[in-house]
Structure formats: structure tokens, C-alpha cells
């Protein structure tokens, strides 16, 4: 009877949500003369042995952040573009994707553009981690170094491009309760020196994810993506990587479950609409209990305004219909819902005043 299986599906989704929060998925595109094609890696031990030392090290750096898995697509060493890799990743549910350690400015920009298109299409929601690309887009993390071009790990120096896999792995491995802000990169021993913190502040405000010497170690300055222009859709809070990750997760889980368990499987009655709403509310409540979204702030209901407009477009006169009548009206195959959630940020800015007696 009704849609109890939808409720079960959302419950299952909430459990998997917790798992995603503690270990996301990374996509890496590399070029190599060996091991062409796709590889799904669960640990450094599964990295193809015949890859070049640089490529193996690049993949290893992703695992420093403890992602759940790393999807690697190996292009021929002479490949001039990422077309074949894009075909592989077109429907893969990955959280962060980066290009090869020698990625050019053109390819980095192209990867950012590809991700933007995929996010707009709505089927998958990856985030690109690229070096020195001014994308002004929430789906791109622009990894930069302030005041120089290389960071040091002992005696070895790396460019931002060579360290994008490390950043992608770190971001993917974060629990959704925390942000990337001030997360340490313990292996990094030095970054370019800057004259003052204001220089770092300016870089962050320009949409750069940068490293910062906190005095006790090298950390991520603030967990931001490249979005700088705020709109009604791309709001101020979506500059934060953490906020976007939770929003993407909710969008994906709800969409997947509706497509799998609801679309085409039940009559579009008012009662079934209400059961779907109840299922979504149950899912959101579990996310509230995990601390991803604010408690008692989640709303999901029939969108009366859109439903009324739809009815009018089909020739139904709604002038004498109250809101409840509109909610219960026959809308063919269409379902119009609306909702809101309050995604919780992490503690990042603290102002303390202590009075001495």
C-alpha cells in the first residue's frame, strides 16, 4: 500500500550519506605510456605498478587525504586533450576531479568548463580541483600558492598542478561536519613567504584555495571554491566547499531515490504526493541528527504557486479554488514540491573578549 518502500529507500540513503561524508570519491586524469584506460583504486597498493614514478606519486598523494576510492583514467602519454577521460567520467559519481600533474592552463580551464557543464545538466555534481584558474564558479576549486610558484616537501618542490591530487583527496576525505579550513598538510615543510596576512586574505577573497603558515604548520587558509560573484542562485554561503558538498549530497540522494522508487511506479494522487513528502522529510531529519543541517528547520511541501500555474496552463480555472483544493487537484504526471534546509557551516571565525579583574 502507498509508498512505504520510498521511506525505506530514504532511510538507506541517509546511512550511505554518513559513509560518503567520511570518505568521498576522487577522479584523476593522467597521461602515461602504460596502463591505458580506467582503474578504480581503493589504496596505494592497487596503483598500477607500470606507471611512471611521477604519476604513481601523484596518485599516492590523493590517498593521503583518505578518500573512499580514487578513479583514475590513464590517457596515452601523447594525448592532447581529455576527451576520452570525459567520456569515462560522464556518469561517474565522483566528488572531486583533477587533471594530470603537468596540466596546462588550457586543459585546466577546459576541465573547469566541463565540470560546470556537468553540474548544470544535473546528473552528476563533481567539483574540479585545478591550479591557477580564475573560474568564478562554485564547482571549481582554484588551488594557488600566494607569493610564489612552488611548495616544499623536504628537499622536493612541487607546483600547484602537482599537488591538486593531494587537495582533491583531502577534500574528499573530510566528514561533512567539518570544513577544510585550517586542515593541516603535515608533509609540507615550506610555502612561499608573504609579507602579511592581508595578502592571503585578498587571495581567499579572490576565490583561491591557498596554503597558509599558521606558525605551527602548513594548513589550508580557508575552505573556499572559486565563486566570487554572488547571485540569487549562487549565494554567499556557496563559496564554502563544505556547504556546497552537503547541498550536492542532498540533491543527489533525493533525485536518485525519486527516480529509482517513485517515477513511473505509482499513481500521481494527492495521497502519494504526501507520502513522498513524508519520505523526504524523514531523510532530512536523519541529516539533521548527523549535524549536517540545522534541526527543525527543514521544510518540504507541495508548491501551491507552481501547481496553480500548471493547472491554469491546462485550462483549469483556479479562481475559486483555495490552496488545499489546488494541492489535491489532478496534475497529470507532474509533481510540484518546494522545500528549504539550513546547512550548517563549521566554526571558523571566533571573536573572544576576556575581561580581567
Locate each region found by the language model:
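Intrinsic-disorder/low-complexity loop/linker signature
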Residues: 37-38, 68-71, 148, 155
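A glycine- and small-residue-enriched flexible loop/hinge signal that marks low-structured segments
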Residues: 2, 10-13, 25-33, 87-260, ...
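Well-ordered, non-membrane alpha-helical segments in soluble/globular domains
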Residues: 52-58, 80-84, 106-118, 276
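A short, well-structured beta->alpha microelement
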Residues: 70-87
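Structured, hydrophobic secondary-structure cores that serve as assembly/anchoring elements
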Residues: 1-61, 67, 213-357
Amino acid at each position: 500500500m502507498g509508498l512505504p518502500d520510498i521511506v525505506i529507500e530514504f532511510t538507506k540513503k541517509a546511512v550511505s550519506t554518513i559513509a560518503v561524508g567520511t570518505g568521498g570519491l576522487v577522479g584523476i586524469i593522467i597521461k602515461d605510456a602504460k596502463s591505458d584506460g580506467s582503474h578504480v583504486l581503493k589504496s596505494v597498493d592497487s596503483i598500477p605498478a607500470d606507471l611512471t614514478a611521477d604519476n604513481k606519486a601523484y596518485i599516492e598523494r590523493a590517498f593521503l587525504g583518505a578518500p573512499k576510492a580514487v578513479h583514475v583514467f590513464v590517457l596515452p602519454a601523447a594525448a592532447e586533450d581529455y576527451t576520452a577521460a570525459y567520456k569515462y567520467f560522464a556518469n561517474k559519481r565522483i566528488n572531486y576531479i583533477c587533471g594530470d600533474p603537468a596540466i596546462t592552463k588550457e586543459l585546466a580551464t577546459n576541465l573547469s568548463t566541463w565540470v560546470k557543464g556537468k553540474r548544470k545538466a544535473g546528473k552528476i555534481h563533481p567539483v574540479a580541483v585545478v591550479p591557477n584558474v580564475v573560474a568564478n564558479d562554485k564547482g571549481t576549486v582554484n588551488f594557488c600558492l600566494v607569493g610564489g610558484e612552488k611548495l616544499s616537501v623536504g628537499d622536493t618542490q612541487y607546483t600547484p598542478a602537482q599537488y591538486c591530487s593531494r587537495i582533491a583527496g583531502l577534500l574528499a576525505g573530510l566528514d561533512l561536519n567539518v570544513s577544510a579550513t585550517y586542515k593541516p598538510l603535515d608533509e609540507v615543510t615550506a610555502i612561499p613567504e608573504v609579507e602579511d596576512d592581508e595578502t592571503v586574505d585578498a587571495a581567499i577573497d579572490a576565490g583561491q584555495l591557498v596554503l597558509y603558515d599558521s606558525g605551527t604548520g602548513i594548513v589550508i587558509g580557508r575552505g573556499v571554491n572559486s565563486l566570487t560573484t554572488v547571485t540569487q542562485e549562487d549565494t554567499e554561503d556557496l563559496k564554502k566547499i563544505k556547504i556546497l558538498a552537503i547541498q550536492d549530497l542532498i540533491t543527489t540522494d533525493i533525485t536518485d531515490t525519486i527516480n529509482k522508487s517513485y517515477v513511473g511506479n505509482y499513481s500521481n494522487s494527492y495521497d502519494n504526493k504526501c507520502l513522498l513528502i513524508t519520505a523526504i522529510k524523514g531523510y532530512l531529519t536523519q541529516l539533521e541528527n548527523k549535524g549536517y543541517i540545522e534541526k527543525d528547520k527543514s521544510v518540504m511541501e507541495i508548491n501551491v504557486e507552481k501547481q496553480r500555474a500548471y493547472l491554469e496552463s491546462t485550462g483549469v480555472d483556479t479562481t475559486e479554488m483555495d490552496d488545499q483544493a489546488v494541492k489535491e487537484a489532478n496534475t497529470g504526471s507532474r509533481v510540484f514540491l518546494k522545500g528549504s534546509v539550513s546547512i550548517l557551516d563549521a566554526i571558523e571565525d571566533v571573536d573572544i573578549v576576556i575581561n580581567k579583574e
